[in-house]
């Protein structure tokens, strides 16, 4: 007799579900991986399904490997069941058909090499613009949504997209290259138009199990529909409330489509084995504000429902804390991190990489150990920070040629690169335009001289100012902030908020140092930490690092859990991020906030800023249903 004693009633119902399509709605911490592996065992041992006919699809290689390893602990059939990502499965289908050859898969560098020459034929282009085009092409191939695709491209390039897309596809075809997104399109066409191939794969996979079904895109859904046409045994596991990848083309609406088109049965895994009841209740108050979702009634496991216990001196496990400004919020975080038990896991979750690095830099200075899961670009390598540091080096008289080249026309100063001799200085530039032995008009020489003299006076002030005042002066008085706004309008309006956040971060960070040299050394030390991996570990093992606090973006925290979680900056423009009022955008941002809240097992603190009378900050709208948790 198959053992089901370790299953709760909902899990048991899902595991022993008979033939046909099933949508298993799996709330946070509800044991979905356990249920999937138990289902595979039940199919093999009770329904006598051949392991080779079972296909288990995940969204990442790590998830596929993890699930296969979990299954291997309970069964000797792990090597026979087909575990893989959408892309790896579709690649095998295309290989068998001969539509792709081994070695034809294009990596990121190869794709950049294909698109660079095409872009440069049209206009000057940066690596950032090339990357935005590749992202847009991938999004378009996955979704076919032209309007949203164009949002990913700088404004001045939008009219060029159709032509550049055609030229890129032509170049890719010439080298017989295939990228991940082509595989979806090719696979769908193969299964639609090639009856023998379609029938072979339909017979091959009699049962299809899909994890994280809320992250599926429409093309992936269509391929699953083709594969499942014969048997219709699709076991789709997901939670539409945790759908946070629309920027990759994910469409949680496919879950509703699956229920309609397949007439799928629905089962809800309602018991949360991770979080205390207070956290479950608070997170539900937030997510219930979303309208476009499957309604759910969730509860904590019996063990997590004991409310009489106090934790850290309070009977409630969820608290909202308000602070006047970011430094006050940071002081509170430092205090909490220093007093916590190192035996417990804890994490600070951020909406953006920038906010995460700001806290990481401060923890490093305070000697508080931390790890970062995701590989993240060093903020000090961002062009804005590099520009600011070039200004400071010019003021200090330690600048090199590259520093002048970076900022001569940020903002525009009428200065040509031809004015640069072997040794560059502001005085040398002024001499070049003053002597008038160049090819420029008298008016042009006069304007350049005026700009350089003003620049010299500005740099004299910067030279004698402490870093925070110096950076503020460069941004405001020297016109660097104005230059960024103009550039954002030309390239991509979506960059405006990101660049504004970076400038605010630089000003705040500069305030921790007395000299530019001291600040430069701190930047180098932080960069060294990232390079050596002191501040970053990959994989779930990092969760158990001795006494270290985990720093993660919300997206990177998905699937993880911690005893204590802090979510700083629960303010408008951060949660939800940006200025968009589109209902779809707000609902996704609310889901992101929900995912962050549901990472907590025992203790959850939501931190927000109130600002000052002159510069008020507004708490996130997502906190409105949580007023009773204010402390």
Which residues make up each language-model segment?
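Helicase P-loop NTPase motor core
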Residues: 24, 28-36, 40, 263-266, ...
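Conserved helicase NTPase motor core
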Residues: 4-16, 20-24, 55, 63, ...
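P-loop NTPase Walker
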Residues: 1-104, 199, 281-284, 598
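ATPase/helicase motor core of nucleic-acid motors
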Residues: 261, 314-315, 340-467
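Helicase C-terminal subdomain and adjacent C-terminal extension
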Residues: 611-631
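Conserved helicase core region in the C-terminal RecA-like lobe
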Residues: 82-92, 209-212, 237, 352, ...
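Accessory C-terminal helicase-associated subdomains
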Residues: 436-556, 577, 623
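ATP-hydrolysis module of ASCE/P-loop NTPase motor domains
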Residues: 17-18, 78, 99-182, 205, ...
């Amino acid at each position: 007799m198959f053992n089901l004693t370790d299953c709760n009633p909902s899990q048991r119902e899902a595991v022993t579900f008979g033939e046909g399509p099933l949508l298993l709605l799996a709330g946070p911490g509800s044991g979905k991986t356990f249920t999937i592996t138990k289902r595979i065992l039940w199919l093999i041992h009770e329904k006598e399904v051949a392991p080779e006919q079972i296909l288990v699809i995940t969204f990442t290689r790590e998830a596929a490997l993890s699930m296969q390893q979990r299954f291997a602990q309970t069964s000797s059939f792990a090597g026979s069941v087909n575990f893989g990502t959408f892309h790896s499965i579709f690649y095998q289908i295309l290989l068998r058909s001969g539509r792709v050859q081994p070695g034809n898969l294009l990596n990121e560098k190869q794709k950049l090499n294909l698109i660079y020459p095409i872009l440069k034929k049209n206009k000057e282009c940066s690596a950032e613009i090339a990357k935005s085009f590749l992202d847009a092409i991938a999004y378009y191939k996955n979704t076919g949504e032209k309007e949203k695709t164009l949002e990913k491209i700088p404004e001045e390039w939008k009219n060029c997209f159709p032509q550049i897309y055609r030229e890129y596809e032509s170049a890719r075809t010439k080298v017989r290259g295939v990228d991940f997104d082509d595989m979806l399109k090719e696979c769908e066409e193969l299964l639609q138009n090639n009856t023998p191939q379609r029938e072979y794969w339909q017979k091959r996979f009699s049962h299809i199990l899909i994890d994280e079904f809320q992250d599926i895109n429409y093309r992936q859904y269509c391929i699953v529909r083709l594969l499942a046409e014969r048997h219709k045994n699709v076991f789709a596991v997901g939670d539409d409330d945790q759908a946070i990848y629309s920027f990759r083309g994910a469409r949680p609406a496919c879950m509703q489509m699956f229920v309609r088109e397949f007439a799928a049965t629905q089962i809800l895994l309602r018991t949360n084995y991770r979080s205390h009841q207070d956290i479950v209740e608070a997170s539900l108050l937030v997510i219930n504000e979303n309208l476009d979702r499957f309604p759910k009634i969730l509860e904590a496991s019996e063990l997590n429902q004991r409310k009489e216990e106090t934790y850290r001196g309070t009977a409630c496990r969820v608290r909202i804390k308000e602070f006047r400004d970011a430094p006050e919020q940071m002081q509170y975080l430092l205090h909490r991190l220093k007093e916590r038990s190192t035996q417990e896991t804890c994490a600070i979750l951020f909406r953006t990489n920038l906010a995460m690095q700001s806290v990481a830099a401060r923890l490093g200075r305070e000697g508080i150990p931390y790890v970062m899961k995701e590989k993240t670009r060093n903020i000090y390598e961002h062009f804005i920070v590099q520009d600011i540091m070039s200004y400071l080096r010019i003021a200090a008289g330690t600048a090199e040629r590259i520093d002048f080249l970076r900022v001569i026309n940020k903002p525009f100063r009428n200065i040509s690169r031809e004015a640069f001799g072997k040794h560059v200085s502001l005085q040398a530039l002024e001499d070049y335009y003053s002597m008038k032995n160049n090819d420029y008009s008298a008016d042009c020489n006069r304007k350049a001289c005026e700009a350089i003299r003003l620049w010299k006076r500005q740099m004299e002030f910067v030279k004698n100012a402490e870093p925070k005042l110096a950076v503020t002066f460069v941004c405001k008085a020297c016109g660097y902030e104005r230059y960024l706004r103009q550039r954002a309008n030309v390239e991509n309006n979506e960059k405006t908020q990101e660049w504004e956040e970076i400038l605010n971060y630089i000003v705040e960070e500069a305030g921790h140092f007395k000299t530019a040299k001291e600040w430069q050394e701190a930047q180098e030390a932080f960069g060294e930490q990232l390079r050596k991996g002191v501040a970053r570990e990959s994989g779930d093992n990092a969760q158990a690092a001795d006494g270290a606090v985990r720093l993660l973006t919300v997206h990177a925290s998905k699937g993880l859990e911690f005893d204590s979680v802090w979510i700083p900056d629960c303010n408008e423009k951060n949660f939800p991020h940006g200025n968009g009022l589109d209902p779809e955008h707000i609902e996704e941002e609310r889901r992101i906030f929900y995912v962050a809240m549901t990472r907590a097992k025992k203790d959850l603190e939501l931190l927000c800023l109130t600002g000052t009378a002159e510069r008020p900050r507004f708490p996130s709208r997502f906190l409105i249903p949580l007023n009773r948790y204010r402390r």
